UniProtKB/Swiss-Prot annotation:
Coiled coil: none annotated. InterPro entries: Nucleotide-bd_a/b_plait_sf, Ribosomal_uL23-like, Ribosomal_uL23/eL15/eS24_sf. GO terms for molecular function: rRNA binding; structural constituent of ribosome. This is Large ribosomal subunit protein uL23. The keyword rRNA-binding applies. The gene is rplW.
Length: 99
C-alpha cells in the first residue's frame, strides 16, 4: 500500500463514551475510515502510522440520519467505522504518535 493511501484510509478517531471504555478496558480503538477501505488496508494503515501490531479489525457502515431543515428533509452522509483491537502488550497513544 502506498504512503498516500495510508493517509486517506484513516479519517480520524471516533470519540464517544463507548469508544473510551473500549480503549481503557480492552485496548480497542475506534476510527472513522474511508467508505471504500478494506479491513486489510485499515490494519496496514494503523500499523504504519502508529507503529503497533493489530490483532483484529471489525468494520461497520453507519447510515446517515435524516434531518429536518427549514428547506425540507436532508440526509447526513453515510460513513464507515472500524474497531481496531491491538495485540497483547501493545498500546496506542494519540498524543505521542502525532509528533
Amino acid at each position: 500500500m502506498n504512503q498516500e493511501r495510508v493517509f486517506k484510509v484513516l479519517l480520524g478517531p471516533h470519540i464517544s463514551e463507548k469508544a473510551t471504555v473500549l480503549a481503557e478496558s480492552k485496548k480497542q480503538f475506534v476510527f472513522k475510515v474511508a467508505t471504500d477501505a478494506t479491513k486489510l488496508e485499515i490494519k496496514k494503515a494503523v500499523e504504519a502510522l502508529f507503529d503497533v501490531k493489530v490483532a483484529n479489525v471489525t468494520t461497520l457502515n453507519v447510515q446517515g440520519k435524516t434531518k429536518r431543515t427549514v428547506r425540507g428533509l436532508g440526509k447526513r452522509n453515510d460513513w464507515k467505522k472500524a474497531y481496531v483491537a491491538l495485540q497483547p502488550g501493545q498500546d496506542l497513544d494519540f498524543a505521542s504518535s502525532a509528533e
